[in-house]
């Protein structure tokens, strides 16, 4: 005969009745993390947002939040956090990290190109020869003309048109 249990008496050895207790603070921390994830998603461009695996409800909520200002945006971020609680945030976070890392790599490349341009204008032919050994596809004559023009503009205190053109040329030829 089965043993009767009172209402307050729980058999903790029974696996079916095992309950995992989560503290209220942990729930709040998780909720805040999801709201921050939602805020990061709102800051993305539409092209980058398409690269993130989101369902239609979440995409619509994010698009709406992008058009809101201040208090409405804050409420919408809370709503996005609520929607994220019902989904697995790991694939979304991984895709977001990939998008952000790609952006950081692009920024680092642009900074490197700026340094190369500065070296070309300041050091002249020695820097140009070094650059051409690394990137033989570059047009030597065109680069020399741009470098000379940038140096003359700097001496005459004119706007740096050739200086910018060197950067654009390097960006199109090296970055791609």
From Swiss-Prot:
Location(s), subcellular: Cytoplasm
Any one GO MF annotation of this record: ribosome binding
UniProt xrefs under InterPro entries: DarP (IPR006839), DarP_sf (IPR023153)
HAMAP family, sorted: DarP
Disulfide bridges in this chain: none
Stated name of the protein: Dual-action ribosomal maturation protein DarP
UniProt xrefs under Pfam families: DarP (PF04751)
A GO term from the CC aspect: cytosol
Lineage, opening ranks: Bacteria, Pseudomonadati, Pseudomonadota, Gammaproteobacteria, Pasteurellales
One GO-annotated biological process of the protein: assembly of large subunit precursor of preribosome
PANTHER family (UniProt xref): UPF0307 PROTEIN YJGA
Family: Belongs to the DarP family.
Function as written in the Swiss-Prot or TrEMBL entry: Member of a network of 50S ribosomal subunit biogenesis factors which assembles along the 30S-50S interface, preventing incorrect 23S rRNA structures from forming. Promotes peptidyl transferase center (PTC) maturation.
Protein species of origin: Actinobacillus pleuropneumoniae serotype 5b (strain L20)
